[in-house]
Amino acid sequence: MSSNLPAAFANNFLGQSSTWYKTTILAFLVINPVVYAIDPFIAGWVLILEFIFTLAMALKCYPLQPGGLLAIEAVILGMTSPESVFHETEANFEVILLLIFMVAGIYFMKDLLLYVFTKILLGIRSKIVLSLLFSLVAAVLSAFLDALTVTAVLIAVAVGFYAVYHQFASGGGLSSNQYDHTDDSKVDSSNREDLEGFRSFLRSLIMHGAVGTALGGVCTLVGEPQNLLIAQQADWNFVEFFLQVAPVSMPTLIGGLVTCIAVEKLGIFGYGAQLPDKVRTILMDFDKQETSKRTNRDIAALVVQALAGVVLMVSLALHLAEVGLIGLLVIILLTSFNGITEEHRIGHAFEEALPFTALLVVFFAVVAVIHDQHLFEPITHMLLHMDESVQGPMFFIANGLLSMISDNVFVATVYITEVKNALVAGDISREHFDLLAVAINTGTNLPSVATPNGQAAFLFLLTSALAPLIRLSYGRMVLMALPYTIVLSVIGYIAVYQLAAG
């Protein structure tokens, strides 16, 4: 027994992950103290690359454990402190509240969402029109709500669609209650090709929607967390923010929608998959079955969900309270008026978001390392000492590149603070400050679609229950985002350059 104990420890470490992956993480943990002893600055950048690696391998092992071990070691080594981690977490408390309560609130609206989107999916046969609709609706919603909430809606809808067909493909019919849609072992061989086609179809729709959240999120004061931060420093109201950013956000919105049409038309970068006929038939049968067995109580529940949806949108658009608190309001309204009062039924709503919330706090620990080790400082100083005529476009590029690897809220905070200090000191004019604020806002919002760690909504999608179901890996997300990354970055750069040129 004693001889097998070390093997048991080794097997338990990171669970079912591959041996090579476990070895790699252990190697990281051994190497980091050595690199830190040589040069803390280099060690900080090594930690960022290691954390990105854990995100890239999210389908092999959830990043919370390996990323968490790396973050704990960073604190122990002194690369950052518990106080700094807490400060970064506290600064993003609104995002944490949003994840805990808003995602759970969306869970209790899934019946209505599935009903509405089933009608849309079955009513529109053109994949290009459907893709454009997903992207445009996500953009409009994100301009007035927030990207994480919209992404949570997209995830809930896609999981609902997937579960319906997967259950049928596994021989479970359309009415079996005891069913696990994560298990492919029972899928009939005759249905596997259609299942793969359906996965590809859902992947493309979800990615169009996810990029749509970035297209709309950049436009308004409430679209992304960093937008509000920038608006506060620039003293812009809702309308002024929209008008200041519009010379960049509107061309990129058009470019994004054209890209959506182009990739679907050409069938490149993983796009172009059509909804298999058999899947369409099953979804139509499901819709008919649900309609036929819908009772007055079910209809009442849908009405309550619709009314709660109106309350949600109005509250968010008018910013009546923090997003997370509005999510809690939705939970209370839906569970109260739809009779969901058992603790175990309520608890399921929180299963999706809490692991990601924990991962996000680990991410904030990495951000704390970036802050305490001043990893971005050389780039910041270089930009502020450039000629004013090129500062705008260069700020756009720098913010875009850094937001691809770090938290875009953190990047925006660093740069808008430095620029505001320069304005207060009289080093730059108010007009130039406005230009740089636009460059920072668009730089952190647009090119950051390149990687899942660039935007919280993308990271949430990558680590959600949906990603493994539709085989949406880190690499595949990067590939599918690539045409959007290129188009948004180029158009955004040109627009900022034109704005700077006057």
From Swiss-Prot:
Q: Molecular function terms in GO for this entry?
A: sodium:proton antiporter activity
Q: Keywords on this record?
A: Antiport, Cell inner membrane, Cell membrane, Ion transport, Membrane, Sodium, Sodium transport, Transmembrane, Transmembrane helix, Transport
Subcellular location per UniProt equals: Cell inner membrane
GO cellular component, as recorded: plasma membrane
TM spans (from-to): 27-49, 66-86, 95-115, 128-148, 149-169, 241-261, 299-318, 350-370, 394-414, 450-470, 477-497
Which PANTHER family does UniProt cross-reference here?
A: NA(+)_H(+) ANTIPORTER NHAB (PTHR43302:SF1), TRANSPORTER ARSB-RELATED (PTHR43302)
| Record function comment | Na(+)/H(+) antiporter that extrudes sodium in exchange for external protons.
Q: What HAMAP family does the record point to? A: NhaB
Protein name (record):
Na(+)/H(+) antiporter NhaB
At the highest ranks, the source species' classification is: Bacteria, Pseudomonadati, Pseudomonadota, Gammaproteobacteria, Cellvibrionales
Q: Which gene encodes it?
A: nhaB
